[in-house]
């Protein structure tokens, strides 16, 4: 689910995702805390697939600020966890990531941006991402 809130010409963007599986799920098909290229992008700063189990929940938020000269910046944060069953969800085990990014609007008549994001997560290597379009 996504929600976008206008704030004096800027945007607060919110997103949450929930995945659940049952039965004998192969490791490669298990839900994970996401770090995917393309338009779906959560947990920038956390290595892809590091945390997997039968269920996953993730939330992220961004503050997007645009300048009049086609440049802008974002600050973002993510939190979430994986779990084997509903009874195993432990909020003290949630993983967190955060960071900032720069934006360049490719054409004035389009909302497509070139973006550079730098993400951090405790005890993980810094992530650097150069992509087109917003994370979500």
Language model: regions and residue ranges:
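Membrane-embedded beta-strands of outer-membrane beta-barrel proteins
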Residues: 1, 14, 59-61, 100-102, ...
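C-terminal outer-membrane beta-barrel translocator/porin domains of Gram-negative envelope proteins
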Residues: 1-67
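Transmembrane beta-strands of outer-membrane beta-barrel pores
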Residues: 3, 18-24, 65, 77-83, ...
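Short coil turns and loop connectors of transmembrane beta-barrels in diderm outer membranes
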Residues: 7-10, 67-69, 108-110, 124
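Residues that define the transmembrane beta-barrel architecture of outer-membrane proteins
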Residues: 10, 53-57, 92-98, 124-128
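Transmembrane beta-strand segments that form the barrel wall of outer-membrane beta-barrel proteins
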Residues: 11-16, 43-49, 73-81, 85, ...
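Outer-membrane beta-barrel translocator domains and adjoining extracellular loop/strand segments
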Residues: 25-33, 85-92, 127-131
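Outer-membrane beta-barrel "beta-signal"
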Residues: 99-109, 125-136
């Amino acid at each position: 689910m996504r929600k976008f809130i206008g704030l004096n010409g800027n945007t607060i963007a919110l997103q949450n995702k929930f995945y659940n599986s049952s039965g004998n799920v192969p490791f490669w098909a298990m839900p994970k805390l996401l770090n995917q290229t393309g338009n779906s992008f959560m947990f920038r700063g956390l290595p892809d697939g590091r945390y997997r189990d039968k269920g996953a929940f993730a939330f992220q938020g961004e503050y997007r600020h645009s300048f009049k000269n086609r440049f802008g910046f974002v600050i973002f944060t993510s939190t979430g966890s994986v779990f084997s069953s509903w009874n195993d969800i432990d909020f003290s085990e949630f993983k967190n990531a955060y960071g900032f990014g720069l934006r360049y609007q490719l054409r004035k008549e389009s909302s497509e941006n070139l973006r550079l994001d730098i993400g951090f997560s405790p005890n993980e290597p810094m992530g650097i991402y150069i992509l087109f379009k917003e994370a979500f």
